[in-house]
């Protein structure tokens, strides 16, 4: 495991599953991450035209927007979110709400469907982390259900506005890209009492440096 011998070992979440073993964001990748001993799994969720939640990173599948496809036309290798969460059990899961066009309303539809799906599952609400680059999606989720942990994704400098926004909104965590993480960010997060979920940690040398800077959770392409 990438950080098995590091000090201040964070919780390790497999980025889209263990896709060194299987195709990313597939049932096989999620099962491989469970077998690899990951602490959790990160995956991406999108909504189809007929309101089904599927796990896929990119906006298109075979040059067609997921949001314009009906579920029966989704390829078999793209899992439904329900099947994906079943494959991830018993690990914690970070569900990223993908937002490509904030004005389209897709993010709100996705969050509403996500809340309906999660609230009837047997796992405790603490099992889920809902993340997004779009704070409006996170705010809508909190309006619908205040029990889920929320994380704001951040990948560009300066990171300070994202940190300030996450703190002011009362989110559980900031999810910075690993290239942004330094002592200043870590100290700022600690002072604000907000968690850091760092993505996507894959280089062992960089991992050693990040271990010094700290982080509550790492999302990594190398869970094993």
Q: Which residues does each PLM region occupy?
A:
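Phosphate-group recognition and catalysis centered on beta-loop-alpha active-site segments
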Residues: 1-224
